[in-house]
Structure formats: structure tokens, C-alpha cells
């Protein structure tokens, strides 16, 4: 509640600075607050308030680089505070509402292909640094799993994910990645049927982008078909994309173990499918 109140207070400053009028109830996400607003010219927009951290830093830069191509359009931004003024989309109609998961995957993949066609600008966090950090943390995580009941299988799975990641880590790529593109981060829009929101900018290989869309709606199955559809739509080498996706499972698993949690059952299922188990 303290963070929420602080962000709302910041919002008052930017309502005044950018000549905005609030016209609805604030929407609160995991790390941000969004105010529906109207600009002085009558244009409807969204004021996004958040703290700057390693995931949100550079969001304005990424949106400016994409220039609204397949993604929400940036109208104003303040890099110091991470505050963004964005075009208004229909928050009540996420891509997750499309009943056919394969159709939703096709739409997401086509948007992702547009985003990852763009080279990352200078100043965006790079995948090679992320991967190096993962390998630095891996030994301690593996050691923490030693001797735990039922953890030997988890340990082997992480070792296999790490082995796959090592095969591609030498070519980390240079595309501008979203890093968190799943069906809830695509909203219906007016100028296009669907637009992407909430990037966590990263420069790297598009194969590192696929896991969120496999994990989201995991229970609806068809994971192999969804993986193939995404790799085909993006024009990715399937084996490299497989390795990067296993690397993404490794990344999320490292975080979970370090927080004292077990591996995510659904991500384990995705990894086993990609490993042919």
C-alpha cells in the first residue's frame, strides 16, 4: 500500500506536468499503477507509474525504438522515474480471451516477429550478461539441491538445461526483445487489432522469448505445436530456439531455488518435453 500511495502521488505530478486529466479508476499491477487519462487535445491515453529497476529500465527507450510497430505507442516518458504516457488500449480484452490457444499463439508470434526484427539500441541490457550471471549462480544452486529428498531429478534437469544453454551462449544475438510476452501482455486496440504492452527490454536472441507464451495457458496443452508455430513464424532455427527456451527455464528455476521454492511444475513439464523425456 505504501508503494501504491507513493506512485499515485507521483501521478499527480505528471498529470500536471503533461496536462492530463484522470478519467477513471487507477489500475494496479504487480509493479505498476496505470491511470486512464485524457490529454489536452482530447486524446485518451494511459499514464503508467512504476519504479525503475533492472526489468523496467529502458522501457521507454524500447517503445520509442519500436515506434508503435506492433506495440503500444509511447507518447511521453520520463526516464528518471520510469513514468510513461501511452496510447490507450482496451485493458478488458487481452489476447488471453481468445478461446483457441493456437489462434492466440499465431497472433502473438506474428507480433513477436515484428518486435524482434528490430536491432536493440545502445543502453539496453544484454543477454550475454544475463547468461554469464546464470552460470555464476548455477554451482551454488546445484549444491543446495544435493541431498534433498526428491531434488535429484530437479538437479539433473537444471544440469541438462545448462548444457543446452552452453551450446548457444556464444552467440547471444542483438535483437530487441520483450522478455515477457505472453497472452496477458497483448491487448485489443483501435489502430490495429492487437498490440503488445509491458516490455522488459533485453538485447539478444529471439529464441529467448518463447517460454512465457508456452507457460501461459500451459494447461491447454498443444505445447509442441505452439513451439513449432512460434519458431516457424519467427523464422528461428528450432534447435537453437529449443536451447534458448531451456535456458529460460534455467533462469526462472535459479530464481525459485534461491528464494527457497521448488521448481515450477509446468516449466518442468515444458523442459521435459523439449528434452524428449
Task: Indicate residue ranges for each PLM-predicted region.
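Conserved NTP-binding catalytic cores of kinases and kinase-like/nucleotidyltransferase enzymes
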Residues: 1-71, 189-193, 261, 270-277
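An alpha-helical support segment within catalytic cores of ATP-dependent transferases
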Residues: 6-11, 15, 117-178, 189, ...
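Active-site acidic catalytic loop and adjacent metal/ATP-binding pocket
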Residues: 27, 33-38, 46-47, 74, ...
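A conserved alpha-helical element in kinase catalytic cores
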Residues: 41-85, 92-115, 221
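Conserved, surface-exposed functional patches that form binding/active-site neighborhoods
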Residues: 104-119, 123, 127-129, 199, ...
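ATP/Mg2+ or Mg2+-diphosphate-binding catalytic cores
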Residues: 144-146, 225, 252-277
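Active-site Asp-x-Gly
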Residues: 188-240, 262-265, 270
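Short alpha-helical scaffolding segments that buttress acidic/His motifs in well-ordered protein cores
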Residues: 244-245, 249
Amino acid at each position: 500500500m505504501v508503494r501504491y500511495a507513493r506512485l499515485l502521488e507521483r501521478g499527480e505530478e505528471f498529470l500536471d506536468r503533461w496536462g492530463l486529466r484522470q478519467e477513471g479508476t487507477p489500475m494496479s499491477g504487480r509493479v505498476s499503477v496505470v491511470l486512464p487519462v485524457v490529454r489536452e487535445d482530447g486524446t485518451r491515453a494511459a499514464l503508467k507509474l512504476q519504479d525503475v529497476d533492472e526489468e523496467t529500465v529502458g522501457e521507454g527507450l524500447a517503445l520509442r525504438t519500436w515506434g508503435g510497430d506492433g506495440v503500444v505507442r509511447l507518447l511521453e516518458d520520463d526516464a528518471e522515474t520510469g513514468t510513461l504516457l501511452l496510447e490507450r488500449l482496451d485493458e478488458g480484452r487481452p489476447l488471453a480471451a481468445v478461446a483457441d490457444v493456437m489462434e492466440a499463439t499465431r497472433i502473438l508470434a506474428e507480433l513477436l516477429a515484428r518486435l524482434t526484427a528490430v536491432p536493440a539500441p545502445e543502453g539496453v541490457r544484454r543477454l550475454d550478461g544475463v547468461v554469464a550471471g546464470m552460470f555464476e549462480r548455477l554451482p551454488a544452486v546445484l549444491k543446495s539441491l544435493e541431498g534433498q529428498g526428491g531434488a535429484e531429478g530437479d538437479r539433473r534437469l537444471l544440469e541438462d538445461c545448462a548444457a543446452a544453454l552452453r551450446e548457444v551462449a556464444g552467440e547471444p544475438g542483438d535483437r530487441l526483445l520483450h522478455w515477457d510476452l505472453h497472452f496477458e501482455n497483448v491487448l485489443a486496440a483501435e489502430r490495429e487489432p492487437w498490440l503488445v504492452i509491458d516490455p522488459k527490454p533485453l538485447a539478444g536472441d529471439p529464441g529467448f522469448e518463447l517460454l512465457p507464451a508456452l507457460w501461459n495457458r500451459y494447461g491447454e496443452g498443444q505445447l509442441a505445436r505452439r513451439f513449432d508455430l512460434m519458431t516457424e513464424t519467427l523464422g528461428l532455427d528450432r534447435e537453437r530456439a529449443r536451447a534458448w527456451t531451456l535456458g529460460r527455464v534455467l533462469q526462472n528455476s535459479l530464481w525459485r531455488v534461491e528464494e527457497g521454492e521448488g521448481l515450477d511444475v509446468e516449466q518442468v513439464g515444458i523442459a521435459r518435453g523439449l528434452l524428449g523425456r
